[in-house]
Amino acid sequence: RDRRQRQMCIRDSLPPERWPQLQGLAVATGPGGFTGTRLTVVMARTLAQQLDCPLLGVSSYALMAPRLERQLPQAMQGEPFWITQELPRRGVVGGQYRITAGQVHELSLPTLLPQGASPQPAVEVQLDVEADVARLLQLLQRSHAAGAAMPWAEVLPIYPTSPVGQV
């Protein structure tokens, strides 16, 4: 039943007769909820493979990095900074970024930080789905215009913590 609902949602949003017109797909790779991240990345990979079209995967933190950097004091902008998120009962997830000439450089992928770690400067995750989706589509357009290959097989979800505890 859930699979059928997802298929209908995809077909309603993008009818199959328009699929050949796709020039590329894009997906946020996380971090995010385990099930949601896994399902969206797998769905995007499957569609890209079956439609033989490029797939751009970008971490959720990299998508929000340009807007979160603006919260830092002017003197710190352009320097490396951390994006962090406290996970109840798990710890703090953090990734390190630097914005130069409008480009996001992901210096450290989001990962579970050692207990007690407090990287600085740091900005707390702030969700803005509309802004992040717009940025993701903008990055897809730029990558496509630049002729980037964007193979689907290289797009993997980011899991900074295990859904089954310590592994």
Enumerate the language-model features and the residues they cover:
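Oxyanion-binding and handling regions
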Residues: 56-167
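DPxDG-like acidic metal-binding loop motif
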Residues: 24-60
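Glycine/charged-rich beta-loop-alpha catalytic/anionic-binding loops adjacent to active sites
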Residues: 21-27, 121-123
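Single conserved hydrophobic/aromatic residue that forms the stacking wall/gate
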Residues: 1-10
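Local beta-strand N-terminus motif with an aromatic residue
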Residues: 6, 22, 78-81
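Phosphate/pyrophosphate-binding loops at sites that engage ATP/ADP/AMP, CoA/4′-phosphopantetheine
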Residues: 11-24
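Conserved beta-strand segments that form the floor/walls of ligand-binding pockets within enzyme
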Residues: 9, 26, 82
